[in-house]
Amino acid sequence: MEAAGSNPVFRSTWRRGGVATQRSAKPCTPVRFRSSPPITMIAITGSGEFLPSILDVDRKLLNYLDDIPHVLTLSTAAGKESDARLSYWENLAIDHFKNLNVRHTHIDARNREDLNQDYVLEEMKQSNFVFFSGGSPNHLYDSIYDSDFSTELHHLEKRGIIAGCSAGAMILGEKMIKGVGLNYLPNTIVIPHYGESFYSWISNTVKVLNRGKYKLLCLEKDTYFVKDADQLSVLGKQNVHIIYKKEHHTFSDGDRIDVSLLQ
């Protein structure tokens, strides 16, 4: 999201054990990183990005990385919203990853032109974890598809984690509620905010979409659907649902998902 002032990018870079800005970081337990074959991971959740309730879940997610995390957050989905709203996402992301004690860069990229600037593409090359927060899924898709940024996103998937919440999750399906997605999850429509009373309209939307050919991947708050190569699983506090016609499968933390359910 965009910071106040003339600078088109606001970047706060966190180091393990300290903050690379003028503010000091509070000591916290470092994330431990696994030693394993390279991952190609997608992790998406229905809601709750950067909030205290998902902190421990994100700590576990970061543990999947093969190397020390370099997290990049982008609130491009909210690019058409107010400066105040963009500042909200910016500050929330900064505080969240500061508490996780990992290196973090927040890029202010509000649209397609912003995303495809050289400094953004270079940040993508240096990162191994990119997170797209909420807003308009269609604006986010229009900002990414068929671009140099999209190419870098595919490269990042081969060495790290593409993560998203709400609109940032929806774009990774083959199709969205309205429009098409980036097709990281073929044959799938991602439905965020599943089961939340504030989004009661989603229940009717699911009924309508379930008449079509796509599998519905319904995500609850603070819970990731994780795709690691050909392995599917759940990480978090609530549930993930796969709905197709008369079938409704529910999964919770630690569950493995048969890949055929999304084929």
What are these regions (language model features)?
Residues 4-7, 13-24, 31-35:
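Short, positively charged low-complexity motifs
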Residues 41-67, 77, 83, 87, ...:
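C-terminal and late-domain segments of enzyme folds
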Residues 78-139:
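Portal/gating segments that form or line small-molecule/metal binding sites
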Residues 133, 139-201:
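Class I SAM-dependent methyltransferase SAM-binding "motif I" and its flanking Rossmann-like core
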Residues 68, 101, 127, 159, ...:
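Short, well-ordered alpha-helix to beta-strand connector turns
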